């Protein structure tokens, strides 16, 4: 995909408005809602660079705004955290294994105004991030194995989700609700078939769902 159109419900498709077109064939374009449901995200990415454009869900007729313009060899993605009036940024800027930063939307175009929450680690790959009103959930990889780490909203450590097997596969499942008190992950090993679990963000209690 390389184009994004705006469609007015009830109108003819031929009347749709082109709001973004990617000229570089090495980039892929996708569209989705932020987990807060307050923004529509247009994500543009290649193997070495990425860029996010935002539209307020309350005003989808406006033009999309660039969060931070693409730069060669800079990959990033964002998580809206309305509870703290910020965006979390999963970025490889000066961090080959990625780190977590934050900024207010009005400061997003200047990386010098981004603030670090989780620093880069040479031995740990930060793969993905989920934001919640009181917590941040990280999917990391160390020594070939993934782990799930729960932080408070300031980035202070709270807990690691424990796995019983020495070798396993774990992944974040669908977690569409920013305001949820739980998050969901998938897990499998030689002894355990692929299953989905929930984790209570306050107590850390795990529950097998299927």
Predicted regions and their residues:
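Peripheral, non-catalytic segments that deliver or gate enzyme domains
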Residues: 1-210
């Amino acid at each position: 995909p390389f184009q994004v159109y705006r469609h007015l419900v009830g109108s003819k498709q031929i009347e749709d408005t082109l709001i973004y077109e990617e000229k570089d064939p090495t980039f892929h374009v996708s569209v989705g809602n932020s987990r807060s449901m307050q923004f529509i995200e247009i994500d543009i990415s290649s193997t070495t660079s990425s860029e996010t454009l935002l539209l307020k869900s309350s005003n989808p007729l406006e033009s999309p705004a660039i969060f931070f313009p693409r730069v060669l060899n800079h990959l990033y993605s964002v998580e809206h955290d309305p509870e703290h009036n910020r965006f979390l940024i999963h970025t490889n800027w000066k961090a080959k294994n990625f780190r977590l930063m934050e900024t207010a939307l009005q400061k997003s175009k200047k990386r010098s105004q981004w603030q670090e929450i989780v620093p880069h680690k040479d031995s740990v790959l930060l793969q993905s991030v989920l934001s919640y009103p009181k917590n941040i959930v990280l999917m990391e990889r160390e020594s070939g194995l993934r782990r799930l780490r729960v932080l408070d909203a300031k980035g202070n450590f709270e807990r690691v989700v424990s796995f019983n097997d020495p070798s396993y596969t774990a992944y974040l499942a669908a977690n569409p609700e920013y305001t949820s008190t739980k998050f969901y992950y998938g897990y499998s090993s030689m002894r355990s078939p692929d299953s989905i679990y929930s984790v209570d963000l306050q107590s850390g209690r795990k529950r097998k769902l299927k």
